């Protein structure tokens, strides 16, 4: 659900309070935090905070006992530099999504579909971009027999796909592909204490 409002209207605090409440109840929470504003729930507050007195007063007014506590978090990071890496296998991404990502033409997309079909039928793992590059090289070297089996596979299209993969690798995307692959359950789990 989206939260809209101007600066200082309490959007971040509202999300933090909701996440803390769900976590305390044992309900896993996933939140996108591009700016890092929500990351504060990973560390317990302290009596040294400039607003501690105001917090204590407010808690007493509404009949609560103020207790600072940290909540379990996992910071996910596409490149694995400042958090837990997010990975997917090439096979899990599939030819359609990968074709869109690479901005392939229709004939090139057809060749990529042939590559995925061949990998599936021959039980070849497509875990990372190196696996896909190796498969495309094999297809280019055996284009006549593969064309007879699946339809025309041009070496020009194979070369174009390989160049697009090179661009993707140069942008650091190779780190995203591989194992262990991210599963939905990885995003929605509790810690050892059920929070």
Residue ranges and their predicted role:
Residues 19-28, 36-50, 54-195:
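P-loop NTPase motor domains
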Residues 3:
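Hydrophobic anchor at the beta1->P-loop junction of P-loop NTPases
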Residues 11:
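Conserved lysine of the Walker
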Residues 14, 18:
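Hydrophobic positions on the alpha1 helix immediately C-terminal to the Walker A/P-loop
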Residues 6-7:
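The conserved Walker
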